[in-house]
Amino acid sequence: MSLNIFWFLPTHGDGKYLGTSEGARAVDHGYLQQIAQAADRLGFGGVLIPTGRSCEDSWLVAASLIPVTQRLKFLVALRPGIISPTVAARQAATLDRLSNGRALFNLVTGGDPDELAGDGLHLNHQERYEASVEFTRIWRKVLEGEVVDYDGKHIQVKGAKLLYPPIQQPRPPLYFGGSSEAAQDLAAEQVELYLTWGEPPSAVAEKIAQVREKAAAQGREVRFGIRLHVIVRETNEEAWAAADKLISHLDDDTIARAQASLARFDSVGQQRMAALHNGNRDKLEVSPNLWAGVGLVRGGAGTALVGDGPTVAARVKEYAELGIDTFIFSGYPHLEESYRVAELLFPHLDVQRPEQAKTSGYVSPFGEMVANDILPKSVAQS
């Protein structure tokens, strides 16, 4: 099975070490462009762009990097409850057209109640998933060309529609990650690809089985992906030394403050990440070559595959055997590590190389819209 390998744009910061300004790197547009172009040339299929108040806006970052890349796809965040699903569908179609079909979308319900309240979203965990289901139902149908009336508990629209369709038909794929039962129910009904953070293979297998069963009950099939950091070197010894070096500036106080901050999250996935290490830096290899050191201070994906190329490839294949076909990798610093992954890991995997993007023609091939709502009358060509 050919694997889709994505990279990551560190719009929330980058550097050689975690938890310190030592070795930190300024992340500006020029640096993000370097990473995106490297990923494009090295054969990564796409890049995940993170979302949240600690990050640059993922949509604007993607739009700014489309003109300087050729094949790379951009996985950007949809935020239910923060934006109208109809407006989000229009934005998604525009990004897909401007990128010639290189737009992918990642549904993010959010897991930090404090940040969500600051964004104006005052829903508890269950309510957020209710709203996310409603949002996604509308978003999908509008992108697929339907005129939508929807009267939900959280969202109501009447006559919602899209005038300019996306390049990808019937619409761009939807990705989503979540570990709660409500999240799995949403994935089973709504998404093309279910993402998990890098838990041990046995835990990942259990989640995949649960989502598969739920999807089958609705007559659907779902693809699977995983989000992991990678520390790959020419030897296993060098890789583990690099892992130790990455957290060499972390002190106990920084770890304790980070874990206290992350503990306020109501994200089940975040709780599962934290439980892998419990803030203890002495037992970080939680499964063979799966290292939880990143999660001592980083929210979200907190584990890394560590080893030489053949060793990391063997672990990747273990996940692939569970049914995972998409791997979203990252590493510190992200520019250099993109080369290491491509040079040391790719040769040991069957990596699906991206094709040249489609040509979109014109955004509006039929002239100006009549009264902002009606397609101009078609004239037969003789």
Swiss-Prot record:
Citing just one GO molecular function, the answer is: alkanesulfonate monooxygenase activity
- Name the InterPro entries on file: Alkanesulphonate_mOase_FMN-dep, Luciferase-like_dom, Luciferase-like_sf, SsuD_RutA_monooxygenase
Q: What induces it?
A: Repressed by sulfate, cysteine, or thiocyanate.
EC number(s) for this protein?
1.14.14.5
The record's Gene Ontology biological-process terms are: alkanesulfonate catabolic process
Q: Which SUPFAM superfamilies match?
A: Bacterial luciferase-like
Q: Which UniProt keywords apply?
A: Flavoprotein, FMN, Monooxygenase, Oxidoreductase
Q: Which Gene3D superfamilies match?
A: Luciferase-like domain (3.20.20.30)
Main EC class the enzyme belongs to: oxidoreductase
This protein's record includes keyword Oxidoreductase: yes
Q: Which reaction does it catalyse?
A: an alkanesulfonate + FMNH2 + O2 = an aldehyde + FMN + sulfite + H2O + 2 H(+)
Coiled-coil spans in chain: none
Superkingdom to which the source organism belongs:
Bacteria
> What else does the entry mention about this protein?
FMNH(2) which is absolutely required for this enzymatic reaction, is provided by SsuE.
Q: Which HAMAP family match?
A: Alkanesulf_monooxygen
Q: Which family does the UniProt entry place this protein in?
A: Belongs to the SsuD family.
NCBIfam families with a match to the protein in the record: alk_sulf_monoox, PRK00719.1
Instruction: Please give the function described in this protein's UniProt entry.
Output: Catalyzes the desulfonation of aliphatic sulfonates. Seems also to be involved in the desulfurization of aromatic sulfonates.
The entry's protein name is Alkanesulfonate monooxygenase
Q: Which organism is it from?
A: Pseudomonas putida
The gene for this chain is: ssuD
